[in-house]
Amino acid sequence: MDHRLLEIVACPVCKGKLNYDKEKNELICKFDRLAYPIQDGIPVLIEPEARTLSSDEVK
């Protein structure tokens, strides 16, 4: 994941900051509790494609 991209992408729901989870290869929005997948190096920032984070994952 290109860290320069993290500086410009935002959560499509709340427009907030996304954090990269290297282990799961996802972009995380803690505010909306959503994890967006990264497929072939491309973030899939479509809400229906995101998975909901558990309360343990939000910490």
Swiss-Prot record:
It holds the Pfam family Trm112p. Signal peptide: none annotated. It comes from the Bacteria. InterPro entries: Trm112-like (IPR005651). One of its GO terms (cellular component) is cytosol. PANTHER family: PROTEIN PREY, MITOCHONDRIAL, ZGC:162634. Belongs to the UPF0434 family. This is UPF0434 protein PBPRA2383. It comes from Photobacterium profundum (strain SS9).
